[in-house]
Amino acid sequence: MRSKNLLVATAVATALAGATSAYALTPAVTAAIPADHQLVIAGASAARDAVEAGLSAATFCQAGTFNRYRVATTNSPDLRAYSCTLATGSPYFNDTIENDNVVIFYRSEGGSIWGPGAIAKNVPVARLVVNASCTLTDGTNYLCPVSNYNLANDGQTATGNITRTLVNLGVADLEPEMFSGANWVEPGTPLGNEPAAGVLAALPAVPVIGQAFGILVRSDSPVAALSVQDITSIFTGNYGDWSQVPGSGTTGPITICRRERGSGTQTGADVFFNGQNCSPSALPFVHSTDNPPIFGNTVIENSTSSSLGTCMTANTNSIGISVANAAPTGTKFVTIGNQAPGRATAAVGSYDYWFEATMTKAGGLNTTVGLIADGLIAVVQDDTTIPTVNSAFALSGLGPVSAPNAAVLPVSTTRPVALARRGSSEGNSCQKPQAQN
């Protein structure tokens, strides 16, 4: 009898893992969710807020069923997971999967390139594991133990709640082809060498949201405004001292706090200011080793946004790059062309330093996994679910087929829709924003 009861209990638990529930999914239930209801995402940290906002929408996940999982050590490595029961009657996905339990893994460690890059190379990447080792901290938030992670080998020697799997959906701050050349990862990582010419460009990327980026200086710096020409001159090493920058009001050798290769923030700065991957006469971005500044001033490469903020506060006369949300402690954003960075100025067309974030589905996905991915793309595109952070805004023409995003004046102060797009419906970071008819 005991054996029979055990079999019944096991069958019930398995059924619950893939069927209806009206409560937040426990780690045990989440761990039992079958593979065809698991979606593995990798890539941009800047776009992660948009994904989480979409998942939090009651039209995607049923209210009260959403749980969030993170690594116990804050933001390093940045591996996350979300579980919930899919909503009924949702405009975002096929009704064959509504009311099902799903788990979505999001790996943003290393930045954008680890999404489309891993898909292009067909290599597994590190992601979180959800099980009974994850402990509830508050409400719906769990922390899971991971130790000894190293980006250089992407966790191959790490221990704890970590594994390596192929990527189903890549998220990047720009279209995949922008991550070639100087913006492919440093040599020696599991991603290996850059794929053959044309492979990244051929990936089926779709734009999802607009994101504004900005230039940081220290809070105690008198520098408040810079031109595109000034910033390009600094990032190419042609300005090495603030005394060379017209109207800076200060002097001293400039320290450049940049991001690592493969970061969407770094790639965007390289594209916008230096023309990388857009012009045959593109200028190389300063680097600590293979392209040092001609004046010999310091360049510090940072693997995360938080470490870049630390770099800024630790170095007098520093300059850095960031998605245009709240400036890190001890720093401030400058205006570019007398325009402050943010969703409102970007959406209305007065601030050009922004890009269309993209999502790329891997080929050959299981039907159910593909439906979950399609639903996630749709909810992230929707202007009603865009996160209310300063950097993010919706793109016109995207969103639900029944009610696509529409650009109107005056633009919303919380969830604006851009009056213009970069290039065609597939996005083109090399083109200036223009109205879409």
Language-model features, listed with the residues they occupy:
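Flexible loop/hinge segments at secondary-structure junctions
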Residues: 24-437
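Bacterial N-terminal signal peptides that target proteins for export
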Residues: 1-8
